[in-house]
Amino acid sequence: MEITVINGSPRLKKSNSEILKNYLLNFIKENKINEYFSFSIKLDNNIKTNIHNSDILIFIFPLYVDGIPSNLLSLLLNFENKKLINSKTKIYCIVNNGFFEGVQNHLAISQIRCWTKKVNAQWGQGIGVGSGELLSHLKKVPLGQGPLKNLGIALEKFSKNILSLKSDEDICINPNYPRILYFLQANVSWFMIARKNKLKFKDLFKKIYNK
């Protein structure tokens, strides 16, 4: 089976989407895998052929203003205009965000589902991952354990559906981590960044325009 995975994050290899991609690849690595970044992909004839011949097409990307990042959206339109998507191809997606709740990704998943219908392909499933900013801090934690327990369970089910070409209901997950602690750490990180840039605590509350 030929599987194409497209990372839709502008942060490329330094992105949380790349971390999620690598987790997923551990479940599906026995297949032929094509990997691309939507930000830098060049649609030459070889890549066009790979896209068209894919049994599975997986988009992994961050949530941008409740939707799809512009670089990935541009690529989707390109695929659509060039009629690259095979009607037999099954499409899946994983969306992550900086909010605690994974359900915040549901609109972006719906957008990919609608696009799938528009290009006459087959919809598989979507995963909405909350608290994506935690991922880079949990690289030493085994997938499926601790804060990554829910993610491990979701990716295992997701990968089984991929390998069996099965469609299923979308999954939205939160980390196995206290919500209040997540927000506390997020706020502290801003203070640390401010100090690193020689700013004071009060500088974080300055406004460009005063009424």
Regions picked out by a protein language model, each given a short descriptive name:
Residues L20, I28, N96-F99, N120-Q122, ...:
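Iron-sulfur-associated redox domains of electron-transfer enzymes in respiratory
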Residues E30-N45:
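A short beta-strand-loop structural module common to alpha/beta enzyme folds
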Residues I127-K211:
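Glycine-rich phosphate/pyrophosphate-binding loop and the adjoining helix
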